[in-house]
Amino acid sequence: MKRPVTGKDLMIVNMGPHHPSMHGVLRLIVTLDGEDVVDCEPILGYLHRGMEKIAENRAIIQYLPYVTRWDYLATMFTEAITVNGPEQLGNIQIPKRASYIRVIMLELSRIASHLLWLGPFMADIGAQTPFFYIFREREFVYDLFEAATGMRMMHNFFRIGGIAADLPYGWIDKCLDFCDYFLTEVVEYQKLITRNPIFLERVEGVGIIDGEEAINWGLSGPMLRASGIPWDLRKVDRYESYDEFEWEIQWQKQGDSLARYLVRLSEMTESIKIIQQALEGLPGGPYENLESRGFDRKRNPEWNDFEYRFISKKPSPTFELSKQELYVRVEAPKGELGIFLIGDQSGFPWRWKIRPPGFINLQILPELVKRMKLADIMTILGSIDIIMGEVDR
């Protein structure tokens, strides 16, 4: 029997779009020399839904349910950016109570997002046990969301001028109990994961990005802070009420996958500190600025017509976006989430450009995986933390 000759040519492998470690419908065309990665080409667009064009044909209140489908694991941030832009264009003041509740919801959403990053990331590198512990804690966060907004995901809770509803009776005590419980669980994660020699072997020194490289690639969020750059928009822009709370920016110097893990784990602890301060200092007063519902045009008797009121062929009168442009951003769990908004003195935006953090952070993936092993692709991709809903929009 003649033994087959071993091939020495490069091999091209498709990873995804239907792959359990792709975190959505991402396709990677990987060129391999044995186990070594020679080249990697990401193919995007499988989840493109035209979110920017949809925004140009919707009033802000109509568009709010759409934005929760960008990053569907951290929907409070997409809602926040959607209302912050029109609020700044219209110079609308937010009641202090509404601002505090927004901060609480944003930080709970950050914890939920980081938890749902950590569980699959550990599963990607072969650790199944933490996955189940992490989903247990995430369920408590979703219970809080459901009690306050009526929905576990896709909350549709933020409004121009405030929020949709006040916190229900007993919610604050329930949230404080969760904060005390969760701090003990983070310590358990550190015992279970951080000192594990197999985990350290998979992540330490893998996917290193130095500070200058991170800035040149336009990285943001934990990707940037893990490379030695302590940059956080909550400190820089001081939006909402973040400047009224005491907390520290979490950052690391190593720039590898381990550093990105440590940054996200520490951020969850800082989020708990912010939530506890906001709950203990929660002011009274209204939860929405009702004047933001007004509009400058004189009342038109045509608005009572059948076409307006019942069959909805014409858009109802609503909040107008003034004729100016604005870039507004928030510190989302994955990085800087921003929109470039151009108003046109109408209820619809003239232009709504989304700056998704996952799309920008994903650009460095081909550079990171070159000269690495095939198994390291999952580690590096997982440490970037992407959701294809916001990458493809």
From Swiss-Prot:
It holds the Pfam family Complex1_49kDa. It is a peripheral membrane protein. It is an enzyme of class 7 (translocase). Keywords: Chloroplast, Membrane, NAD, NADP, Plastid, Plastoquinone, Quinone, Thylakoid, Translocase, Transport. Its EC number is 7.1.1.-. PROSITE patterns: COMPLEX1_49K. GO terms for molecular function: NAD binding; oxidoreductase activity, acting on NAD(P)H, quinone or similar compound as acceptor; quinone binding. It catalyses: a plastoquinone + NADH + (n+1) H(+)(in) = a plastoquinol + NAD(+) + n H(+)(out); a plastoquinone + NADPH + (n+1) H(+)(in) = a plastoquinol + NADP(+) + n H(+)(out). Belongs to the complex I 49 kDa subunit family. NDH shuttles electrons from NAD(P)H:plastoquinone, via FMN and iron-sulfur (Fe-S) centers, to quinones in the photosynthetic chain and possibly in a chloroplast respiratory chain. The immediate electron acceptor for the enzyme in this species is believed to be plastoquinone. Couples the redox reaction to proton translocation, and thus conserves the redox energy in a proton gradient. This is NAD(P)H-quinone oxidoreductase subunit H, chloroplastic. It comes from Draba nemorosa.
